[in-house]
Amino acid sequence: MQPTDWKPMQSVGAGVKEIRIRTGRKAYRTIYIANLPDAVYVLHVFQKTTQQTEQKDINLAKTRLARILRNR
């Protein structure tokens, strides 16, 4: 089952997705990967303050994904 408001985050890695949550004037994002056989991994959750996802948030998710894949 897919969330209703999401998009692929290929800039982070293959199979990574972003759930978009809006509450009033605030926006939140959850970056995760669910195509690994043992678990769903939440890579990063943050409040969005700009129109585009900031590079620091993408880099943090990439670093966490690399660590997960390296330790498998």
Regions found by a protein language model. Give the residues of each.
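Basic, low-complexity intrinsically disordered segments
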Residues: 31
